[in-house]
Amino acid sequence: MLNINDINKRIKQRPPFQMIERVIDWTPGESATGIKNVCINEPYFMGHFPDAPIMPGVLIIESCAQLCSLVFDTEGGNPDIIYVLLKVDNFKFVKPVIPGDQLVITVTKTKIMGPLAVFDAVVKVNDEIRSKGTMTFTMVEKSKIYG
């Protein structure tokens, strides 16, 4: 549904920190399902852990966050707005993610409270849940951060 070029028009992250490579389902303002292919060439595997590489949990959360920002962005990639992760709740890592896995990440908006949006996230590999949790975001104008 969205390829890497389409995604680049809507989210701020870029390689090597861009985690979402393809979006296979997307309802703007509501939900999305995206793909992250986990490759042994990712720089973090050099140190986490060399003898038994595992994708760091914080990067799994970041993958979910990037997909949430795509859902939250209903303005079509406004260059003056940054979507900021404020809070992570009850994120559980059920089984490790290793090189060769393909993450299928689904995020669903569950609540809007003024400028805040709450999302549920589920990460699967081969239809098996690897992690899940809840995330809260807000929109911030770049000028309020950088002047």
What is the meaning of each model-derived region?
Residues N8, D51, F93-K95:
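Beta-strand-rich interaction surfaces with strong enrichment in secreted/lumenal proteins
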Residues P15-M55:
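Catalytic strand-loop segment that frames the active site of acyl-thioester-processing enzymes
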Residues V23, M55-N78:
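Active-site helix/loop of acyl-thioester processing domains in fatty-acid/polyketide metabolism
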Residues M1, C68-V104, R130-T138:
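Hydrophobic beta-strand-centered segment that forms part of the acyl-chain substrate-binding groove
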Residues L2-R14:
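Short aromatic-glycine motifs in intrinsically disordered, low-complexity regions
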Residues G29, I98-D101, T108-G147:
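HotDog/MaoC-like acyl-thioester-processing domains
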Residues E21-I24, D89, V94, T106-T110, ...:
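Conserved positions in beta-strands of structured domains
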Residues R14-P15, M113:
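Short loop/turn motifs at secondary-structure junctions and domain boundaries
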